[in-house]
Regions:
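Vicinal oxygen chelate
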Residues: 10-51
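Short hydrophobic/aromatic beta-strand micro-patches
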Residues: 2-4
Length: 51
């Protein structure tokens, strides 16, 4: 899932019943994080590195 601000998305995961599987890390020109939603679905979150 492409997002504009990965930090904001990750900060909202746990308070809303989800889990951070992998904290944000740099992958080429992207920031990537893996999260699990409250239903157990694993999702990749991506943000383009702008600088």
């Amino acid at each position: 899932i492409y997002v504009d601000r990965i930090e904001e998305v990750v900060e909202r995961v746990v308070p809303n019943g989800g889990e951070i599987v992998k904290a944000p890390y740099r992958e080429g020109n992207l920031w990537v994080s893996i999260i699990r939603d409250p239903a157990g679905n694993v999702l990749g979150v991506w943000q383009e590195n702008k600088g």
